[in-house]
């Protein structure tokens, strides 16, 4: 699911070229995904751009099976501005991107939280909990990304 039609068309084309038949791609707003007992839902480097990340996560929770997992991959960030600047070499660049691209995109949408790409793991996990997930953890961390897992 993606709201960007050209991306969905490209995904369909590539899947067809590779002979993959067990995949489906749909143009859809994240808040309008049909309930279908999915085992896994993922958002890659985009949750912070969404105007209502809590509402979208809650909507995704409703699409998951009882044991389903929501995986959120976000840009690497540490908790706390000073800590992030001091210990995350990419943070200054990411704050710049966030100021010019991510936050304005979020603010232009419904709710307009303006999370930005440097929220840090604690804030991201807090928002997933607000969305109704009972089991939220930082599953992996690389120099470029945080990977969060939300279940139940």
Give the role of each language-model region.
Residues 18-30:
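Conserved SAM-binding strand-loop segment of SAM-dependent methyltransferases
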Residues 39-54:
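A short SAM/SAH-binding and catalytic strip from SAM-dependent methyltransferases
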């Amino acid at each position: 699911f993606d709201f960007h039609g050209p991306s969905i068309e490209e995904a369909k084309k590539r899947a067809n070229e590779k002979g993959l038949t067990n995949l489906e791609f749909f143009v859809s707003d994240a808040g309008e995904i049909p309930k279908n007992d999915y085992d896994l839902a993922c958002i890659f480097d985009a949750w912070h751009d969404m105007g209502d990340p809590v509402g979208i996560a809650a909507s995704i929770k409703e699409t998951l099976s009882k044991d389903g997992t929501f995986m959120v991959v976000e840009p690497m960030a540490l908790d706390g501005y000073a800590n992030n600047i001091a210990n995350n070499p990419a943070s200054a660049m990411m704050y710049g991107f966030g100021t010019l691209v991510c936050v304005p995109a979020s603010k232009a949408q419904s709710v307009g939280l303006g999370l930005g790409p440097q929220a840090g793991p604690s804030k991201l996990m807090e928002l997933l909990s607000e969305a109704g997930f009972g089991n939220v953890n930082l599953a992996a961390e690389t120099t470029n990304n945080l990977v969060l897992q939300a279940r139940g």
